[in-house]
Amino acid sequence: MLLNEKNSRLTLCGELALLVAVIINSFSVVLMLYSGSGISAISSVPFAFSEAFPKLTLGTWTYIFQGLLIASLMYLRKKFIASYMFSFVVGFVFSQFLDLFELYINMLPQAFSWRVLYFIVSYILICIGIALSNRCGLPIIPTDLFPRELSAIIKIEYAKIKITFDVTCLAITALLTLFLLGHIDGLGIGTILAAFTMGKGVAYAGQYLDKNFHFMPYLQKN
């Protein structure tokens, strides 16, 4: 942790930033679901499959979904990208944390006022976590990587791609649960609100990070 004297921004280790992002994002996904407001958009499709086919955990279905996102990016790039495979590994760690937090989340109180707080906290943390991931200078989890890379490929601003990606995930989740379970599951008012606003929330969090921090991966120093 160093102070960049040129612009007074604090320099932080990129690897540490990535680890923090993975932990808070996985915790926030579980916390948002626990709040009763619905699953976050980035995990809504794996959630639908975990409810329809519960022999595999949410974390496992997340890993499968992330693999499909990586394959899609390689198809769009029309070449093999080595860093995408590291992103796949990071996604596996994220999936394991999802299952870990699911084991212990029930320890938290479930009163309505608490659940409102859980949604607010999870929303803010996801925005910070995604913004942190996008700036750590390292491959990030595929659900965060996909909108960022797609934005670069098709030359459309990130916030618009992020919102479109989230809304598409929710639409797929609604259709999957409706046909596989007979009713729409996992989607709540919080899910819809987050899907249509989180792109901007991530942008605001990113502006704050850019103003106050600079991230340098340790591997780039050597």
PLM region descriptions:
Residues L2-N222:
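Core subunits and conserved enzymes of cellular information-processing
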